[in-house]
Every structure is written in C-alpha cells, then in structure tokens.
C-alpha cells in the first residue's frame, strides 16, 4: 500500500527590488560614455598627427641622413630637371665649323633673375660687374652692368637676396656689393684665409631653391665677354637646388662675425646624396644619377663627398676616355710655403692611361699669368705617350687671341673652364686643378652620370672636341712666335 503523500506548493520568496536607475539617468550615462570615447579618439588622432607633423618638420629642417643605412638608396627625385650648358665666348673668338652655340652666361643669368620670385643665393669669389676697376670705357662691360642693374631690382620686389663672398686679403673693389646692400640685399664676407688659409672660390646661384647655375664664371663683367667660361644651369630641379642650398648655408654660417668651422656640423647641413648614394633624377627626359661635392673637407658635413674624392672617382671609373679642360694644372700645393709635391690627380691620370689604356686629353689654358712651372709637369705627362707603354695621353694649350685693345684689359682673354667628361660621367667644377684648391679653398662641383646620346655628357664631350680641334689649341712644342706674347708656357 502506497503511503499517502501530501504535496504543498513551495512559495519562492520574492526578490527584493534592485536599486534601478531611472531611465533618463541611464540614457545620460550612455551619452556621456559615448562622448568620452569620441574625445579619447580625437585626442589619439591629434597626438598621432602632431607626431607625424613634427617628424616631417624635423626631416625638412635637419635632413634625414640618420634614417638611412650605408647601403640604402634615398628615394628618387621626380622633378622634371632640365640641364643647359652655358658658355661665355670672348669677343673675337670664333668657331666657324661649330654647330649652333650654347646659350651665353649672361643670357642664362638674366633669365634666372627675371624668373626669381622668393629667393636668390649667390656664392662668389669677388664682384666687379662694372669696368670701374679698369678705369676704361670698355663697351663689352655692358652685359655685366645690366646683370648688376637687374640684381638691384630684386630685393625691392620682395626677393630675399643673400650673397656670400670671399673676404678680400687686400684692396678690392666693393662698389657692386655696396650698391646691392643699398638695394636691400644681404651680404656676408667669409674669411676663408682665417678659417682654412684659402679663399671662397665657389661660383654658383640658387634661385627659389628650384633652379641654379654652377660653373667657372666669376661675378665679373669680363667673365661674360672677355673670358672663356663654361657652366650649367639646372631648371626645375628643386631636389638638387635644395641640396646646393645646404652648401650655401654653410658659407652663410661661416660669414658670421667670429664664426669657426664646427668640429661636427649640425644635421641641418647633412646630405643624403653623395658618391655612394647619388640622387636619381630625370634629366632632360632621361634617367641620370647626380650629386654635389664640396671642398675643402672641413666644409663637408656628414654625407657630403669631398670634391677631390669625387673627381678621382670619375678618373678611376673611366674606361674609354678622359677629357679635361681646366685653366691651371699643377701637381703641387702651389700656394703653400715651401711648395709641396701633390700628385693625387696626376697619379690618377697616369694610372688610367697606363693600366687601363684610357685615352687622356688635357686642354690647359695659357695666358700672360700662367705659372711657368706648369710646363715641366705637362711635358712629363705628355711623355707617357709612347709606343712601348701604349699610353694614349696628349696635352694641348688653349690660347685666346687678343687684339691691341683687348690685350690692354687686365686679367682677360683666357680659357677659364673647369670641367671633365668621360664616356660615363660629367664633372663641372669651380676649382683649378692644383692641390690648394682641394685642401684649403672652398669650391663646389656637380657630378652627373647619364647614358645615351644627346644628354648633358655628350654635349660636354662635343664642346671639348670643338675646342681641342680648334685653331686656338696648340701642342706643347708649338713655336711661341706663332701665338704672340699671350702665352707664357711656349
């Protein structure tokens, strides 16, 4: 018999009411939470954006060399760079068999001045754009005088004009610089004699940090009409122009009173572009590699290739030919006392022709101020041309003729070129080829490697061959009577 069970429903105790928030307070809390999340997001974005901005400003101001390892190539430059070779051909110097000539230096300078909008930086040796220094009425000075007039118009139009010039060691005309100061330009004299026992021999312009001129021409009226000069104008090439501005900024810094060369240059002056990592550019529509070198070595901040190293690299990498056109060639420290033998370039040229069979041609200037000791060194180089050594090296002297009136113009009628061209590379500099110009004197060079015909390299080669084959080039054994009294080396 089953026991009778009694079932009774158990009563679950009622839950005590929770401390619930009113609906309006819940909504307010959710809104506040959402707002806090948005504020936090905005703060995070602001911090990230500020960090990115400061990084960009730092890189723009101080350079980004430190971000790249020794084997990392910096990003290419996408500017449509255009290079134009410009020349000053002295009055009365004709090349009847030459094709259409290059633009003149004065045309190029006036064009750069006409296009300047914000800034013009000029690094220069000395200034005499009028012929007041000669106390003559020379009509060919008009081009230099026009350049000076146009320069004086820039600062009143809002263009920031800065001029770095070598401090003279003795009396020197200052009228041009005084006129430019009065027009609103800024001028600083760099005492290279105190700093390195040299001079500021550089010759370049930078316009709007976009275009520049670099070459052999001084700020001298004779450099436009009475002296043979060669340079290059780079248009629409801000990457290279900004890098050249860094070299100018070093001069500008050293032009301050009491300045000295830093033991370590601040990063502001550093560059990423050099012999090891040249700038990749599009030059006249074709790919090219380019960089700027500087002298002397104490004026080379981190990343900057010294001028001598750059020059020797071009010589050492030539496999077919080396053509050199330079005013002075001396394997000595000619301005040191006592004189010292300095065979750095001489050894490189001898090695190139003897070891690699490179064809070497030197076109050296000869005029009334040539150093007589050059002849012995040039004869020594020329003596390597021998059937037993199979060395192919030749030396010629370029003499600019002068009539009676032209001969009276002081420091004129000379080939002042300073360039080298090989089958691979172009070197356009501002220095003569003797030791002190690379060890003590401030100079700058542009180096370009470019393949193909029709480029800057082939144009410079054509100019050299035009001059080499001209009636103004003479072998070292030429009779002095055939060139008059214009040359001291025959």
UniProtKB/Swiss-Prot annotation:
Positions bound to phosphate: 201, 203, 218, 416
The reported result of mutating residue 228 to R is: Decreases exonuclease activity toward CpG-free or CpG-rich ssDNA substrates. Increases mitophagy rate. No effect on protein maturation or trafficking to lysosomes
GO CC: one term? Answer: lysosomal membrane
**Active-site positions on this chain:** 201, 203, 208, 416
**Reported impact of residue 426 to A:** No effect on protein maturation or trafficking to lysosomes; displays differential exonuclease activity depending on ssDNA sequence, showing increased activity toward ATP6 CpG-rich ssDNA sequence and normal activity toward ND4L CpG-rich ssDNA sequence; increases mitophagy rate
List the Cytoplasmic topological domains: 1-38
Q: What is the effect of changing residue 390 to D?
A: No effect on exonuclease activity toward RNA and CpG ssDNA
Catalytic activity as recorded in UniProt: Exonucleolytic cleavage in the 5'- to 3'-direction to yield nucleoside 3'-phosphates; a 5'-end 5'-dephospho-ribonucleotidyl-ribonucleotide-RNA + H2O = a ribonucleoside 3'-phosphate + a 5'-end dephospho-ribonucleoside-RNA + H(+); a ribonucleoside 3'-phosphate-2'-3'-cyclophospho-GMP + H2O = a ribonucleoside 3'-phosphate + 2',3'-cyclophospho-GMP + H(+); a 5'-end 5'-dephospho-2'-deoxyribonucleotidyl-2'-deoxyribonucleotide in single-stranded DNA + H2O = a 5'-end dephospho-2'-deoxyribonucleoside in single-stranded DNA + a 2'-deoxyribonucleoside 3'-phosphate + H(+)
Tell me the outcome of changing residue 354 to A.
Retained in the endoplasmic reticulum. Loss of exonuclease activity toward ssDNA
Membrane-topology annotation of the record: Single-pass type II membrane protein
Consequence of mutating residue 6 to R? Answer: No effect on protein maturation or trafficking to lysosomes
* Localization per record: Endoplasmic reticulum membrane; Lysosome lumen; Early endosome membrane; Late endosome membrane
Molecular-function GO terms, alphabetical = phospholipase D activity; single-stranded DNA 5'-3' DNA exonuclease activity
Primary location: endoplasmic reticulum
- Alphabetical list of SMART domains matching this protein: PLDc
Q: How does it assemble?
A: Homodimer. Interacts with APP.
From the Swiss-Prot or TrEMBL record, give the protein name: 5'-3' exonuclease PLD3
Q: Which organism is it from?
A: Homo sapiens
- Quote the gene name from the UniProt entry: PLD3
């Amino acid at each position: 018999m089953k026991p009778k069970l009694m079932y009774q429903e158990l009563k679950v105790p009622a839950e005590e009411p929770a401390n619930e928030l009113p609906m309006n307070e819940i909504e307010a809390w959710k809104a506040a939470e959402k707002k806090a999340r948005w504020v936090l997001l905005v703060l995070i974005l602001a911090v990230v954006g500020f960090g990115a901005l400061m990084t960009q400003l730092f890189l723009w101001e101080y350079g980004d060399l430190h971000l790249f390892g020794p084997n990392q190539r910096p990003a290419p430059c996408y500017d449509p760079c255009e290079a134009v070779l410009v020349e000053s051909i002295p009055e009365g110097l004709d090349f009847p068999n030459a094709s259409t000539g290059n633009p003149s230096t004065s045309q190029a300078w006036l064009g750069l001045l006409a296009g300047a909008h914000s800034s013009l930086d000029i690094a220069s040796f000395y200034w005499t754009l009028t012929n007041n220094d000669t106390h003559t009425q020379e009509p060919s000075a008009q081009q230099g005088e026009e350049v000076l007039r146009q320069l004086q118009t820039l600062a009143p139009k809002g263009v920031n004009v800065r001029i770095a010039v070598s401090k003279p060691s003795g009396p020197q005309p200052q009228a041009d610089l005084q006129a430019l100061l009065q027009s609103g330009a800024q001028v600083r004299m760099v005492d290279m004699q105190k700093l390195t026992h040299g001079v500021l021999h550089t010759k370049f312009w930078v316009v709007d940090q976009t275009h520049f001129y670099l070459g052999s021409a001084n700020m001298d009226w004779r450099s436009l009409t009475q002296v043979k000069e060669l340079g290059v104008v780079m248009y629409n090439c801000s990457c290279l122009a900004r890098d050249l501005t860094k070299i100018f900024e070093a001069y500008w810094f050293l032009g301050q009173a009491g300045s000295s060369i830093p033991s370590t240059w601040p990063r502001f002056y550093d560059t990423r572009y050099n012999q090891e990592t040249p700038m990749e550019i599009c030059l006249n529509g074709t790919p090219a590699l380019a960089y700027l070198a500087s002298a002397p070595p104490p004026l080379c901040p981190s990343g900057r290739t010294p001028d001598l190293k750059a020059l020797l690299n071009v010589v050492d990498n030539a496999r077919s030919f080396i053509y050199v056109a330079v005013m002075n060639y001396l394997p000595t420290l000619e301005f040191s006392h006592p004189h010292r033998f300095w065979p750095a370039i001489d050894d490189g040229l001898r090695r190139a022709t003897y070891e690699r069979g490179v064809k070497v041609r030197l076109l050296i200037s000869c005029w009334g101020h040539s150093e007589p000791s050059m002849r012995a060194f040039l004869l020594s180089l020329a003596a390597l041309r021998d059937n037993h050594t199979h060395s192919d090296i030749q030396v010629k002297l370029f003499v600019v003729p002068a009539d009676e009136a032209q001969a009276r113009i002081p420091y004129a009628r000379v080939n002042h070129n300073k360039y080298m061209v090989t089958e691979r590379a172009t070197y356009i500099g501002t220095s003569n080829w003797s030791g002190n110009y690379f060890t003590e004197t401030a100079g700058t060079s542009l180096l370009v490697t470019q393949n193909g015909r029709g480029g800057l390299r082939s144009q410079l080669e054509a100019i050299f061959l035009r001059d080499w084959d001209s009636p103004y080039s003479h072998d070292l054994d030429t009779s002095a009577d055939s060139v008059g009294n214009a040359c001291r080396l025959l």
